[in-house]
Protein backbone atom coordinates (compact mmCIF):
# COMPACT_ATOMS: atom_id res chain seq x y z
CA UNK A 1 0.00 0.00 0.00
CA UNK A 2 1.28 3.50 -0.85
CA UNK A 3 2.64 5.72 1.89
CA UNK A 4 0.15 8.35 3.03
CA UNK A 5 1.24 11.92 2.33
CA UNK A 6 0.83 14.72 4.82
CA UNK A 7 -0.96 17.97 4.08
CA UNK A 8 -0.50 21.37 5.70
CA UNK A 9 -3.71 22.96 6.96
CA UNK A 10 -4.90 25.24 9.76
CA UNK A 11 -6.86 24.10 12.82
CA UNK A 12 -7.99 25.80 16.00
CA UNK A 13 -4.99 26.40 18.25
CA UNK A 14 -6.65 24.48 21.10
CA UNK A 15 -6.81 21.37 18.88
CA UNK A 16 -3.27 21.72 17.51
CA UNK A 17 -1.59 18.79 19.28
CA UNK A 18 0.15 15.82 17.65
CA UNK A 19 -2.11 12.77 17.65
CA UNK A 20 -5.37 14.72 17.79
CA UNK A 21 -7.93 13.36 15.34
CA UNK A 22 -10.82 15.26 13.80
CA UNK A 23 -13.38 14.95 11.02
CA UNK A 24 -13.28 17.85 8.57
CA UNK A 25 -16.82 19.22 8.24
CA UNK A 26 -16.24 21.88 5.58
CA UNK A 27 -16.03 25.65 5.36
CA UNK A 28 -17.91 27.89 7.82
CA UNK A 29 -19.75 31.01 6.61
CA UNK A 30 -17.30 33.08 8.70
CA UNK A 31 -14.49 31.92 6.37
CA UNK A 32 -15.98 33.74 3.37
CA UNK A 33 -13.77 36.84 3.65
CA UNK A 34 -10.69 35.29 5.28
CA UNK A 35 -7.39 35.73 3.43
CA UNK A 36 -6.11 32.26 4.46
CA UNK A 37 -9.32 30.26 3.92
CA UNK A 38 -7.70 28.10 1.23
CA UNK A 39 -5.15 26.85 3.77
CA UNK A 40 -7.92 25.91 6.24
CA UNK A 41 -10.30 24.39 3.73
CA UNK A 42 -7.97 22.15 1.74
CA UNK A 43 -9.19 18.85 3.22
CA UNK A 44 -11.90 16.41 2.10
CA UNK A 45 -15.27 16.93 3.77
CA UNK A 46 -16.31 14.04 5.99
CA UNK A 47 -12.82 12.48 6.20
CA UNK A 48 -10.96 11.77 9.45
CA UNK A 49 -7.51 13.34 9.90
CA UNK A 50 -4.72 12.95 12.47
CA UNK A 51 -2.37 15.80 13.35
CA UNK A 52 1.23 14.69 12.82
CA UNK A 53 3.23 17.89 13.38
CA UNK A 54 2.41 21.33 14.77
CA UNK A 55 4.10 24.28 13.06
CA UNK A 56 4.84 27.70 14.54
CA UNK A 57 2.61 29.65 12.12
CA UNK A 58 -0.41 31.22 13.83
CA UNK A 59 -3.30 33.28 12.39
CA UNK A 60 -6.23 35.19 13.86
CA UNK A 61 -9.47 33.37 13.12
CA UNK A 62 -13.16 34.31 13.18
CA UNK A 63 -14.13 30.67 13.86
CA UNK A 64 -11.62 29.61 16.52
CA UNK A 65 -11.47 31.63 19.75
CA UNK A 66 -7.69 31.44 20.19
CA UNK A 67 -6.89 31.62 16.48
CA UNK A 68 -5.65 28.95 14.09
CA UNK A 69 -2.30 27.17 13.95
CA UNK A 70 -0.64 25.48 10.99
CA UNK A 71 -0.35 21.70 11.29
CA UNK A 72 0.62 18.75 9.13
CA UNK A 73 -2.13 16.13 8.93
CA UNK A 74 -2.67 12.78 7.29
CA UNK A 75 -5.87 10.87 6.72
CA UNK A 76 -6.38 8.63 9.73
CA UNK A 77 -7.53 5.01 9.64
CA UNK A 78 -11.09 4.35 10.81
CA UNK A 79 -12.35 1.29 12.67
CA UNK A 80 -15.69 -0.01 11.44
CA UNK A 81 -17.85 -3.09 10.97
CA UNK A 82 -18.26 -4.46 7.45
CA UNK A 83 -19.70 -7.61 5.92
CA UNK A 84 -17.47 -10.58 6.77
CA UNK A 85 -17.12 -11.54 3.10
CA UNK A 86 -15.48 -8.15 2.33
CA UNK A 87 -13.07 -8.27 5.27
CA UNK A 88 -9.82 -9.20 3.51
CA UNK A 89 -6.59 -7.29 4.13
CA UNK A 90 -5.63 -5.00 1.21
CA UNK A 91 -8.99 -5.42 -0.51
CA UNK A 92 -10.70 -2.31 -1.86
CA UNK A 93 -14.26 -1.72 -0.72
CA UNK A 94 -16.90 0.85 -1.55
CA UNK A 95 -18.65 1.86 1.67
CA UNK A 96 -22.43 1.68 1.62
CA UNK A 97 -24.44 2.31 4.78
CA UNK A 98 -27.38 -0.08 4.53
CA UNK A 99 -28.58 -0.04 8.15
CA UNK A 100 -30.48 2.76 9.86
CA UNK A 101 -31.07 1.08 13.24
CA UNK A 102 -29.85 3.98 15.38
CA UNK A 103 -30.78 2.10 18.57
CA UNK A 104 -28.36 -0.74 17.75
CA UNK A 105 -25.31 -0.93 20.04
CA UNK A 106 -23.05 -1.31 16.99
CA UNK A 107 -24.53 1.60 15.03
CA UNK A 108 -21.51 3.88 15.57
CA UNK A 109 -19.20 1.14 14.25
CA UNK A 110 -21.39 0.43 11.21
CA UNK A 111 -21.64 4.16 10.39
CA UNK A 112 -18.50 5.73 11.90
CA UNK A 113 -17.61 9.40 11.68
CA UNK A 114 -14.87 9.99 9.14
CA UNK A 115 -16.16 7.56 6.51
CA UNK A 116 -17.96 8.91 3.45
CA UNK A 117 -20.64 6.72 1.91
CA UNK A 118 -19.93 5.81 -1.70
CA UNK A 119 -16.17 6.36 -1.44
CA UNK A 120 -13.55 3.64 -1.79
CA UNK A 121 -11.35 2.44 1.05
CA UNK A 122 -8.70 -0.24 1.59
CA UNK A 123 -9.05 -2.77 4.39
CA UNK A 124 -5.79 -2.22 6.28
CA UNK A 125 -6.41 -4.78 9.02
CA UNK A 126 -9.02 -7.29 10.15
CA UNK A 127 -9.38 -6.86 13.91
CA UNK A 128 -11.84 -9.70 14.57
CA UNK A 129 -15.52 -10.50 14.85
CA UNK A 130 -18.20 -8.02 15.85
CA UNK A 131 -18.62 -7.94 19.64
CA UNK A 132 -22.44 -7.80 19.36
CA UNK A 133 -24.84 -9.79 17.21
CA UNK A 134 -26.13 -7.80 14.25
CA UNK A 135 -29.82 -6.93 14.58
CA UNK A 136 -30.25 -7.73 10.89
CA UNK A 137 -28.55 -11.12 11.22
CA UNK A 138 -25.47 -10.17 9.19
CA UNK A 139 -22.04 -11.70 9.70
CA UNK A 140 -19.80 -8.71 10.46
CA UNK A 141 -16.08 -8.21 11.01
CA UNK A 142 -14.33 -5.35 12.76
CA UNK A 143 -11.76 -3.82 10.40
CA UNK A 144 -9.48 -0.83 10.08
CA UNK A 145 -9.89 1.01 6.79
CA UNK A 146 -7.92 3.74 5.02
CA UNK A 147 -8.85 5.86 1.99
CA UNK A 148 -8.04 4.09 -1.29
From Swiss-Prot:
Origin superkingdom: Archaea
One Pfam family matching this protein: UPF0179
Annotated TM spans: none
InterPro entries: UPF0179 (IPR005369)
Family: Belongs to the UPF0179 family.
Protein name, as recorded: UPF0179 protein Mboo_1959
Amino acid sequence: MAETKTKVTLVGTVLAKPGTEFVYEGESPECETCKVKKACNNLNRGHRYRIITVRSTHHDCAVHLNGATAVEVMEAPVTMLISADMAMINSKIKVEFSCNKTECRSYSLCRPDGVVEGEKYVVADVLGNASDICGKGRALKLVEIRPA
